[in-house]
C-alpha cells in the first residue's frame, strides 16, 4: 500500500472546495452572531468520560480512543460537538438565564456516518440553553431554516417528530421507559404494523390500538396531526407533544416546500426529550440539517438545563452550493 493513501472515508479538501467551505462557515457564523449566538471552540480531544455524557453515550462506538501519555487516562477524539458545548454551558459559563452558543469544527468518527457519510465531518451548529418553552424550539428551527436560506439552499423539505408521543404510550402501557420492549421499539421504527399488532395483542385495547396507529401516523403535517388527535389517547403528554408539532409546523410554513410529520421516528430516543426535525433538499438523499430537544444534557456537568439545537455539515453544504455556481 502506498504510504500516502488516506484512510477510507477520509479526504483531502482541495482549494476550490476549501474556499466554498470557508465562505459558508463565515456566512453562517455571522448569521448566528447577528441573532445573539456566541461562538465557542471546544478542544478536539477530551477525557473520554466527559465526551460520553448526555447525548455522548450514543456516540461511544463512534469515538476514537487513545491513552494520554501524560496522565495515563483514556481520551476520546470528539465525534460530536454537542456534549462539549453542553459542558461549556453547564460547567464554565454557569449563566442563569437563556444562553445561545454556536460552534464550527471537525469531528472524527470510527464509521462513516452523519449528513455527508464521511468519517471526518465539518460540523457547524447552534444551541439554545435554559428555555424549555415551545418558543425556543421555534427559534432554533427558524434559525436553521434562515441559515439555509442565507447560503442559498432552496427547495427544502422538513420532517418533524416527537419522542414524547412514544414515551407517553410506553408509560401508559407500563412498558420499560428506557426504550420500551426492544422488539416493539424496533418494529415501530420500521413501521411493521403486523408485528406491532402481534407484540401489543395483550395490552388493553386503547394502548394496543394507539401503538398500531403509530405505525401509520406519518405524512403531510396537517393530516397526521388530525389523525393523531383522533386515534391516540387524549393524555396531557400526547396533547402537549402534538401542540408543539403544530406550532413548529406553523413556524416552517412558507419556508419549506413540503412539511411532514413522522410519529414513529424514534431516532435519538435515548437522549431526545421532545421535538426533532430533519431538513432535506431536492436531489439529496440524506438530511442536510438535523435538530432536536435534549433537556437535562448538562446534568452530568452539574446543571441540568433545557436545551435545543441543530447541526449542519459544511462539506455537504459546499457540495450543494457548488452545484449552482
Where are these regions (language model features)?
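Positively charged, Gly/Ser-enriched RNA/tRNA-binding surfaces
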Residues: 17-35, 46-47, 82-153, 200-325
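Residue-level detector of family-conserved "landmark" positions at structurally sensitive sites
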Residues: 42-43, 158-161, 180, 259-262
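Short, solvent-exposed helix-helix connector turns and helix-capping sites enriched
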Residues: 162, 191-192, 220
